[in-house]
Regions:
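Pocket-flanking alpha-helical
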Residues: 85, 103-141, 232-234, 252-257
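Ligand-binding pocket segment of bilobal, Venus flytrap-like solute-binding proteins
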Residues: 113, 119-123, 194-271
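C-terminal motif of bacterial Sec signal peptides marking the signal peptidase cleavage site
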Residues: 34-38
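Extracytoplasmic "Venus flytrap"
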Residues: 53-86, 107-108
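A bilobed periplasmic-binding-protein/Venus flytrap-type ligand-binding module shared by bacterial periplasmic
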Residues: 155-165, 285-298, 321-322
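A conserved helix-loop-strand patch within extracytoplasmic ligand-binding domains
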Residues: 142-196
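Short, well-ordered beta-strand elements
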Residues: 66-80, 98-103, 193-197, 306
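Bacterial lipoprotein signal-peptidase II cleavage site
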Residues: 39-48
Length: 350
């Protein structure tokens, strides 16, 4: 059964990190375009076979689909996903004719729903948030790895820029060991320990483990959501009160609030496999796409579109600023991106 909800009210990005479930970074295998598909209307077998990936047999694609099947795409609880699914919806509905339904769904349920065919695709999956139970659906070939999106993400620890002026020792992560620094970040709830502002507690995170294993005098407090974190940072910035927090790049908010990444030491363990022993920085995340393997038979043209769909980090930054800073509606930001990038997206329908 799918767990659905209202956008912004659910939890995503790697559930169960707090319960020490091991994370598994997906091995990327480049996904080719459909072999000879849509190049002249041929109905030969080679024209209807998608490129194989992840050790799975290439699915047979239905290029005779009439464009009437509803395509269901997963939307996750962060700004980039909100815009990307709108780009997908607008492009598919205009160019392929299929109605598109955006589904707000927990990532754990998303993989199961995609395996069953109830969800068709997700265009933003962070490798560090894929747990073994989710990877199993890719391994059994019921969920297809559709290749890299193109953007590269980086979760990390960020600090307000004025805090670096207030505490020059924060030029190195070791400055966080200073008890006087920690007190400056403290709240009534953390006592003498500094507050580390977490976000949604279900997001992929090692922060509690990093703090414990580096013996830092900090305590994690969760805001509950990206919006709540932005509101807290905005309030603290207005008074130039220091804040240390979990965030990621690319993000419009990082630029808006002049947040600076604190480079942590390289971990001595594989944090993806030994989360509670993690003692160092987060890895870079080459974001990738997934789709239900059943989508190939449901509508091969849409399946082909998802294989070709790609956005760079710069593409994301171009619409994250308006959405995060100017509060532009994601659908409007998507429409603006489409209007400015026809030379890019038109090739996805060749």
């Amino acid at each position: 059964m799918l767990v659905l909800g209202t956008y912004g009210a659910f939890k995503t990005k790697g559930e169960n990190m707090r319960s020490s479930k091991k994370l598994l970074v997906v091995a990327f295998v480049a996904v080719g375009t459909l072999i000879g598909a849509a190049c002249g209307g041929s109905d030969t077998t080679s024209d209807t076979t998608a490129a194989a990936t992840d050790g799975c047999a290439a699915p047979e694609v239905n290029l005779d689909a009439t464009g009437t099947e509803t395509i269901k795409i997963a939307r996750n609880n962060w700004s980039a996903s909100a815009v990307e699914v709108e780009i997908v919806k607008q492009l598919i509905e205009k160019n392929l004719g299929n109605p598109v339904e955006i589904v707000d769904i927990d990532e754990n349920a998303m993989f199961a729903g995609m395996s069953s065919g109830d969800i068709d695709a997700s265009v933003e999956v962070w490798p560090s948030g894929v747990v073994p139970d989710e990877q199993a659906f890719i391994d059994d070939c019921s969920v297809s790895n559709m290749g890299a999106l193109g953007a590269v993400g980086k979760i990390g620890w960020f600090v307000s820029d004025y805090a670096l002026t207030q505490f020059p020792q924060l030029s190195s992560w070791e400055g966080l060991k200073d008890p006087e620094v920690a007190k400056a970040f403290a709240t009534a709830a953390t006592g003498d320990n500094g507050r580390f502002l977490g976000m949604d507690p279900s997001f992929s995170q090692y922060d509690e483990a990093i703090i414990a294993n580096l013996a830092l005098p900090f305590q994690v407090q969760f805001s509950g959501s990206e919006a709540a974190t932005q509101a807290e940072v905005s309030a603290l910035s207005a008074e130039e009160k220091p804040v240390l927090l979990y965030y990621w790049s690319p993000s419009g908010a990082v630029g808006k609030y002049n947040l600076k990444n604190i480079a942590l030491p390289a971990p001595t363990v594989d944090c993806a496999a030994e989360g509670t022993a993690c003692d160092g920085d987060y890895p870079e995340d080459p974001i990738f796409k997934i789709a239900s393997t059943k989508l190939a038979a449901k509508d091969g043209k849409v399946f082909n579109f998802f294989q070709k769909f790609a956005l760079t980090t710069d593409d994301q930054l171009s619409f994250l600023g308006p959405v995060d800073i100017d509060k532009v509606d994601p659908a409007t930001a998507a429409s603006d991106w489409i209007a400015a990038n026809e030379a890019t997206w038109s090739t996805w329908f060749n």
